[in-house]
Structures are given as C-alpha cells and as structure tokens.
Amino acid sequence: MVCNKEVIQGNQLLEQSVELAAQIIELCRTIKPDVINSPIISQIVRSSSSVMANISEGSVSIFSQKERAYRFSISLREIEETMSWLLLMKRCMLIKQDIFAKLSEQCLSIKKMLFSSLKTLKASKSS
C-alpha cells in the first residue's frame, strides 16, 4: 500500500478515509473494553481501516481499472459495515448522538465519492 504524504494530500477520498479511520480509533480508545464492547470495537476499527486500505490500494495507478474498481467496491461494502457498527454503538449508548452524526456524515461523504469513482471507472472502461 502506497500511503505517503504526497499521495494522501492529492486525494480527497483517501484523505477522508484516513481521517475517518483515525477518528474511529480515537473514539474506540475512550470506550471501556469488556466482553460486550470489545468485539464491537474490534469490528468497527477493522471495517473503517479496511475502507482506508482499499481506497489507498485502489488509488494506485499501476493497477488495472478492473482491480481499482474491485478495491473501491470492497471499500463501499466496508463503509456500509462501518455505518452499521456506528448505528449499533449509538443504539447501545456507546457513543453520543453528536459523535454518531459527525462520523455518519463522514461515512456518507466517502460513500458518495466511492460511487462517483466507480461510475467514472466503469464509464472509462466502456469507452
């Protein structure tokens, strides 16, 4: 995975995914780990970091358009999973409404950019 500062700064999708993963890690550090919370914490950290990792890999131009689209489609599934974990965390009162709203908005923004990127890749493939 190529993730140097220049690559991140030039890619809004990657920047936002790194920021989301970092914020979720910071949030999870504040939640008391126990037999119930630990699996939830583990899953949301895994899914949000997978979004970032797959966007990073999909952003590398040495891969084919098919491979890049595949990586972005994985990221799309992982962002959906991240949103589901956030919803569960809010419902179980592990996070406050304002934190849920902020992180959900970030997820939605990333989701929209992923849809747009996939649409562009598919359009250029058929050209």
Indicate where each model-derived feature is located.
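Amphipathic alpha-helical assembly/interaction segments
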Residues: 1-127
